[in-house]
Amino acid sequence: MKKRLIGLDKFFLIILKNIIKEEDIMQLYNTLTRKKEEFIPYVEGKVGFYTCGPTVYHYAHIGNMRNYIGHDILDKTLRYLGYDVKRVMNITDVGHLKSDSDSGEDKMVASAKKEHKTVMDIAKYYTDAFFKDFKALNCRMPDIVSPATDNIDEYIKIISKLLEEGYAYKAGGNVYFDVSKVDDYYQLTNHKEDQMVVGVREGVDFDDNKRNQADFALWFTKSKFDDQDLKWNSPFGVGYPGWHIECTGISLKYLGEYLDIHGGGVDNIFPHHTNEIAQSEAYLGHKWCN
């Protein structure tokens, strides 16, 4: 494959030229199989690359930025090797609760209250701050950056189909994904049902609306948090999307039904990426990520 030098900084090019040989085979670590594998995209020469972006309620810290630097190195290396890369990053500006287990206040709302600003003011300020740091680290801007709040119709479409096909259910005013309806829900991790609290960054509140402890919210209505600033009309009631459905909706919208690479922080393997796989493959009816 012919190498592409356009759009890559000189320092990075020098490094790549010194470490990559013509006969080298690109291998990537696959979290799903827990081993390095030869990278073969679904479509020869093209790469669909999705990365989970920041929740813009505060400044990104050095650990967050280390993650994005890693994605940037991979993005630039793929382009250097001649791949036609389309990289998409979301911006989470709604729906990410303080606990990954669907409990606690929305991080955006909490930050807005603390700083006496609107949620959208908070989102704009910290999004701008994030990309200022991103560029200062010489990271290449993704081809598409999409805020979660710009894609509500996508989430509604996906949730509606999941309800129709029995993968989701309504309870207590909210819509939940039923993890018992999918095979090998824990394929990305070693977690089990009775270990669900492990890996959740903050305390787990029991939700008696759920059929299974590991079920997760696709859509919250006003029955969950009456003071939620951002709400939209939907067939399920006035409310807002859950965190996990946002990445699925944005990825499918911009990259289609087959994804080559999904990147994110190791702290998102469970439950976020685990839930993404479950809902995406239930919706699509086939394997989602390469």
Predicted features and spans:
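The substrate-binding groove and active-site-proximal loops of carbohydrate-active enzymes
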Residues: 112-118, 144-149, 237, 265
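Short, glycine/charge-rich beta-strand/loop segments that flank catalytic centers
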Residues: 88-95, 123-130, 140-155, 173-182
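Polybasic, lysine-rich low-complexity intrinsically disordered segments
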Residues: 2-4, 17-18
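Surface-exposed helix-capping loop/turn segments at secondary-structure junctions
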Residues: 82-85, 136-143, 168-169, 258-259
